[in-house]
């Protein structure tokens, strides 16, 4: 965006995931992620973890799967000095997820992923993330997308709502 003639970025995300395809039933994977989000007072977040995923059902209609993992999360927040929430935390979390990919026809794909991430040994500290995306083919390389995101934190930082949602439209280019 632009503010006062200067460009700025209010959020950023870098994510890497490696999934190993040893067999069709159990797929081990690991990932690492860095991000920040000024609207959530998040100066820095680093996450790394690993686990397994599997597909329960698949066919021409799409795919349904799930996974479980353990992850290490480190966050640094931009909080006022009077904040109750700690401004820097490191926590081990479970990460469980469900994935769904529906293909009603060759020009439409609906995907959904829901994560539930309780603190390891602190099940009252839960984060839930959900994404639903509809992609409609425009050309072989271009899709029009509509995405809905939901984020819930049972212990949000001071001044931040426990529930956050967003609706976005976009174009996805694949080459």
Language-model features: locations:
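Gram-negative (and chloroplast) outer-membrane scaffold detector with strong preference
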Residues: 24-73
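Transmembrane beta-strands of outer-membrane beta-barrel pores
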Residues: 1, 32-38, 54, 70-76, ...
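Residues that define the transmembrane beta-barrel architecture of outer-membrane proteins
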Residues: 8-12, 44-48, 62, 88-94, ...
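Outer-membrane beta-barrel domain signature
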Residues: 2-7, 37-43, 55-59, 79-88, ...
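Repeated loop/turn-to-beta-strand initiation elements of outer-membrane beta-barrel proteins
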Residues: 25-28, 60-64, 102-110, 136-146
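Outer-membrane beta-barrel "beta-signal"
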Residues: 134-137, 163-175
